[in-house]
Amino acid sequence: MRRIQRLVACVMVAGAGALGSAMAAAVPPTIFAAASLEPALDQMAHEGALGTPAPRLVYAASSALARQIENGAPADLFISADERWMDDVARHDAIVPSTRIDLLGNALVLIAPPHSMSKVQIGQGPAPWLEALGREGHLAVALPDSVPAGIYAKQSLTKLGMWQVLQPRMAMTRDVRAALNFVVLGQCPLGIVYRSDAVSEPRVKVLATFPAASHKPIVYPAAIVKGHDDDATRALLAALQAERARGVFRRWGFDVLAH
């Protein structure tokens, strides 16, 4: 009887181990991605372009995601909206350097509500901007000291000689999607966002595109988080570079860099 009990116990332990392994294998990878990637990645996940089961997608400003990863957040893959925050994570030895790629590019645009009569153009000086803002309006911009879209916006406006004049009229947001929503909801008559954000939202129109030379290149690097370099995560990184994903990224207004 004792021998039978021991045998049953062994079978139960083995079965539990196999079940645990199967459950672990079924847990999808987690992507920490810049907020501007939400429409494109959501579409890919919905369509199965990123594998089955679809990965868990966590969106926020790149700065916030980088700090979470550095503090041990359970991310498998990180996609930043600029090189600065990927470099920061790398300095904290939190990514696998050999897996880092430049995945995407983007452009910076000035947006307004679709009914706006504003004729603001880049390079005309601040007067048309102030006229479009009116007495109490604000320019929606992501936080310029930490959020990539805000950093690029500050670089451009500084290069164009308008930062000092426009800064007091800015409504600064936690991420670029929040800046987009300020314009969508009519809370701001103007906003600076990525081209991909404008493509994703029919309730805004693009007034102008900032010259690429007015800011550092907009690059979205991707890398596997240290301790999460497994077959599933590598397959996910490969899926993001596949032709199917490339087509989705292009439709949402991104430039595809990775081959």
Model-derived regions: residue spans:
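Twin-arginine (Tat) signal peptide motif
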Residues: 1-9
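N-terminal twin-arginine translocation
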Residues: 2, 19-22
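Short N-terminal or domain-adjacent regulatory/targeting segments
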Residues: 2-3, 14, 117-121
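Bacterial N-terminal signal peptides
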Residues: 8-20
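Exported/periplasmic ABC-transporter solute-binding proteins
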Residues: 23-73, 82-83, 87-259
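Short active-site segment of divalent metal-dependent hydrolases/proteases
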Residues: 79
